[in-house]
């Protein structure tokens, strides 16, 4: 009788062990099937991991950008092209200089024999001579810097001569000349553009160049402006770098 009871207990124990293992296996399969049918139960964990990874990448990218900007700022500081231009302005320079940081133009003003003269100076650009392909004919650099100028000479009555010019090293080229009456509308100003300057008589053109030279718009002035505006380009770039860095650090 005892032997039979022992056999029964062993069989029951073995059955429970096997059955329990099958139950655990079935439960695991059921859980995986449940997750497959309802992935939202694991989505919060995946979402948090992705958000964390994205935040780390963003911070790393911004820190790298700030380091590169700092390097550019240090390079600019080591250059003498962002210093103040007050010391480099020649004593004989006849114009007052109005230069606001962040403004792409510089304004020169002076009064001469009852006339008010204003020169608006724009940023320099590089002019490339695309037609000069023969190296044997090169007598100098094929690229040169040019500065757009708008010169206005205004009488006390308000009547104005406006010159559109391009300043090259040691040379000024007048592109257009127009007369502006006080109170003229934009349509009137466009109507008073006048003839193409290149079509004028050579003596008349020379007279207008002399007219500007007497009022201080001459080669020595534009040579100074080339150096001044080159420094301004560097100063504006330095200011832009500082503003970008300030944004990235906030």
From Swiss-Prot:
Subcellular location, principal: mitochondrion
InterPro entries (alphabetical): MAM33, MAM33_sf
UniProt key word Mitochondrion: yes
Feature: compositional bias, Acidic residues: 129-141
Transit peptide, residues from-to: 1-52
SUPFAM superfamilies in alphabetical order: Mitochondrial glycoprotein MAM33-like
Compartmental location: Mitochondrion matrix
Superkingdom of this protein's organism: Eukaryota
Residues covered by region (Disordered): 124-147
Signal peptide (UniProt feature, chain positions): none
One term under GO cellular component: mitochondrial matrix
UniProt KW keywords: Mitochondrion, Transit peptide
Assigned protein family: Belongs to the MAM33 family.
Record protein name field: Uncharacterized protein At2g39795, mitochondrial
Organism expressing this protein natively: Arabidopsis thaliana (Mouse-ear cress)
